[in-house]
Amino acid sequence: MNETRTTVFVQDVTLRDGMHAIRHQLAPGEVAQIAAALDVAGVDAIEISHGDGLAGSSLNYGPGSHTDWEWIEAAAANIQRARLTTLLLPGIGTVDELRKAHDLGVRSVRVATHCTEADVSAQHIETARDLGMDVAGFLMMSHMAAASELAAQAALMESYGAHCVYVTDSGGRLTMDAVRDRVRAYRDVLDATTEIGIHAHENLSLSVANSVVAVEAGVTRVDASLAGQGAGAGNCPIEAFVAVANILGWQHGCDLYQLQDAAEDLVRPLQDRPVRVDRETLTLGYAGVYSSFLRHAEKAAQTYDLDVRTILTEVGNRRLVGGQEDMIVDIAMELSEVAADR
């Protein structure tokens, strides 16, 4: 008897999470090139928006070089087969932005909340379902909630209508066992028809390993990006993940060489800071800090003549979450005053 092959839905996040790595500065022409390359390379879905989701362009999160609509239009015009996806954080993006994105061709949305605040996603998930969209719940900073607590939040998102719920390791803090425990906890409480996804970051150099363990535990949707382009040390590098998937005999639609070419030729040249594990990005994972805080902390460190790691460690101690970017400057000011008093 032939065993059923593991099938993986590969979701590329280069044009959304990858925006953090380049401070949300990307021309529509560059979006068009990358989207076209991803589509030809066979990814299942392509996510596009400001790094912090629809309407994320702001002084707090970082202004984008262009609007979400310009980026979405550029991607939509160059995708023939992949599912065009976007991200929405309730409190930043609204159902009006969601409807406009749908009008421009977006057919899937991930509704993201902090890992203990799934209840704020109800209106947005329900609206997306009413629009006929594929909907995933995105529980960010998943390391900050125990597996059972996180699973209860996932069940809430499912009850609102989510087709899939993600273990979202925004801080790149989860180890393989921690990922496995959370996926199994999801599976214990979610309906068999509800999919589970994994969104990993590379801060502890575990993004590929965590994604593989997640699939082995029952995940079907995997986030990844070209050259790992993403916040902090980046996301799971799609080329490496696809290579491992090939070795393991998993079924997917991606062409490894085309992904490698797109990563090297289109994405790496965009980086104004290497997307890699280094002393700063490793600190993100070690301290359990939201990966997109990196560039904000680096700017504050330069302004107040501090070690970035000192700021990030204190951010981790205070358990800051997405949306509290403005507090990074406050922390830097406090640390600078303490240093001056010594």
From Swiss-Prot:
Residues annotated as catalytic: 20
PROSITE patterns per record: PYR_CT
EC number from the UniProt entry: 4.1.3.39
Residues with site note (Transition state stabilizer): 16
Domain Pyruvate carboxyltransferase, residue spans: 8-260
UniProt family annotation: Belongs to the 4-hydroxy-2-oxovalerate aldolase family.
Protein name: 4-hydroxy-2-oxovalerate aldolase 2
Organism this protein belongs to: Nocardioides sp. (strain ATCC BAA-499 / JS614)
